[in-house]
C-alpha cells in the first residue's frame, strides 16, 4: 500500500512537471511579432527612398542644336531664345511646355560660311538680355562672311545665372550683315545648354 501511495505522488509530480514544461514553451510564440517589426521598418525606409524622385527640384540639363539657314550678305534679324525660339521647336514647343522654369547656361554660335572667297563683308551679332531691341546697336562681335568661325557665350553674357519662367524669353541675339548684295553668306549653327526645373 505504501509503495502504491508513493507512486501516486510521483505521477502527480511528473504531470506537474509536464504542465510546467508546456507552459515554458508557450512564450516562444511571442517572439514572432518582433521579427515582423524590422520588416515593417525596412519597408518604410524603402518607401522613403522610392519617394525621392518625386521631390527632385530640377529636371537636369539638355543640349539643343539648331540652325538659322539661308543667310545673305545683307541679312538682318533677331533670334529669340526662349518660348519664342521658332527655329528650335524641340525647345519652344517641346521641353519648355513640360517645365515651369529654365535657364540657358551657354551657347555656341558658329557661322558656317557658304559664300565664295570673293564675297565681301561681315555679319555682326549682339546679345540683348532685356529683350527689347528692334535693331542691332553694337558691332563688337562679328564674323567674316567668307570664313567659318565660332563664338561661345557663357551664362554671364546671356542672363543665364538664374532660373526664370518658361513663358518668357531669356535673351535675344540680333544679327546684321553689312554686304550690299543678296549673295549667299551662310548659316548659323547654334548649340545651347538648357537647365530645367519644376516639371509641370
UniProtKB/Swiss-Prot annotation:
It holds the Pfam family Luteo_coat. Residues 1-54 are annotated as: Disordered. It is found in: Virion. Residues 37-48 have a biased composition (Basic residues). Keywords: Capsid protein, T=3 icosahedral capsid protein, Virion. InterPro entries: Luteo_coat (IPR001517), Viral_coat (IPR029053). It comes from the Viruses. GO terms for cellular component: T=3 icosahedral viral capsid. The keyword Oxidoreductase does not apply. Residues 26-36 have a biased composition (Low complexity). GO terms for molecular function: structural molecule activity. Major capsid protein. Belongs to the luteoviruses capsid protein family. The N-terminal region like those of many plant virus capsid proteins is highly basic. It has been suggested that these regions may be involved in protein-RNA interaction. This is Major capsid protein. It comes from Barley yellow dwarf virus (isolate P-PAV).
Amino acid at each position: 500500500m505504501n509503495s502504491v501511495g508513493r507512486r501516486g505522488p510521483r505521477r502527480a509530480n511528473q504531470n506537474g512537471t509536464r504542465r510546467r514544461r508546456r507552459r515554458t514553451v508557450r512564450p516562444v510564440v511571442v517572439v514572432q511579432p518582433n521579427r515582423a517589426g524590422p520588416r515593417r521598418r525596412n519597408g518604410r525606409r524603402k518607401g522613403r527612398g522610392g519617394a525621392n524622385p518625386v521631390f527632385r527640384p530640377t529636371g537636369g540639363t539638355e543640349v539643343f542644336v539648331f540652325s538659322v539657314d539661308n543667310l545673305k550678305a545683307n541679312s538682318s534679324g533677331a533670334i529669340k531664345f526662349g518660348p519664342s525660339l521658332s527655329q528650335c521647336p524641340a525647345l519652344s514647343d517641346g521641353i519648355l511646355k513640360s517645365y515651369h522654369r529654365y535657364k540657358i547656361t551657354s551657347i555656341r554660335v558658329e557661322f558656317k560660311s557658304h559664300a565664295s572667297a570673293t564675297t565681301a563683308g561681315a555679319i555682326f551679332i549682339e546679345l540683348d538680355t532685356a529683350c527689347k531691341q528692334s535693331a542691332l546697336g553694337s558691332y563688337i562681335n562679328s564674323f567674316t562672311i567668307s570664313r567659318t568661325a565660332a563664338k561661345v557665350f557663357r551664362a554671364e553674357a546671356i542672363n543665364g545665372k538664374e532660373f526664370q519662367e518658361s513663358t518668357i524669353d531669356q535673351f535675344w541675339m540680333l544679327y546684321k550683315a553689312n554686304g550690299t548684295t543678296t549673295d549667299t553668306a551662310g548659316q548659323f549653327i547654334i548649340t545651347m545648354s538648357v537647365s530645367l526645373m519644376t516639371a509641370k
